[in-house]
UniProtKB/Swiss-Prot annotation:
Organism per entry: Pseudomonas fluorescens biotype B
Transmembrane feature ranges: none
Keywords attached to this entry: Copper, Disulfide bond, Electron transport, Metal-binding, Periplasm, Transport
NCBIfam families per the UniProt record, alphabetical: azurin
Protein name, per record: Azurin
Subcellular location: Periplasm
Length: 128
């Protein structure tokens, strides 16, 4: 099983995929986030946050006031399953999930919590 994937983010406020598929055979799963744009992180920064789909917008809303130094995530937010830091052009960061903590019956998703980005930068996370 391929237990990792790389997702690129751009200056056009987009990820290069709308879906992450995780093989149930994986013990852990790693997502590397890259940024192929040219803008710095304070202008067009992106992170990748994984949570239950129902929690995505509330996490992003609560994270607005946290600021860029806290990656636009509320400190100690237990709804966040995993997240990268906010990166800018040419940077990369990764996250690793314990696959055993995911429930096949639950709907998961990924998104960018940078202010205003979730509307365009989100997708599904599926166990298969």
């Amino acid at each position: 099983a391929e237990c990792k994937t790389t997702i690129d983010s751009t200056d056009q406020m987009s990820f290069n995929t709308k879906a992450i598929e995780i093989d149930k055979a994986c013990k852990t799963f790693t997502v590397e986030l890259t940024h192929s744009g040219s803008l710095p992180k304070n202008v067009m920064g992106h992170n990748l946050v994984i949570s239950k789909q129902a929690d995505m917008q509330p996490i992003a809303t609560d994270g607005l006031s946290a600021g860029i130094d806290k990656n636009y995530l509320k400190e100690g937010d237990t709804r966040v399953i995993a997240h990268t830091k906010v990166i800018g052009a040419g940077e990369k960061d990764s996250l690793t999930i314990d696959v055993s903590k995911l429930n096949a019956a639950e709907k998961y998703g990924f998104f960018c919590s940078f202010p205003g980005h979730i509307s365009m930068m989100k997708g599904t996370v599926t166990l298969k």
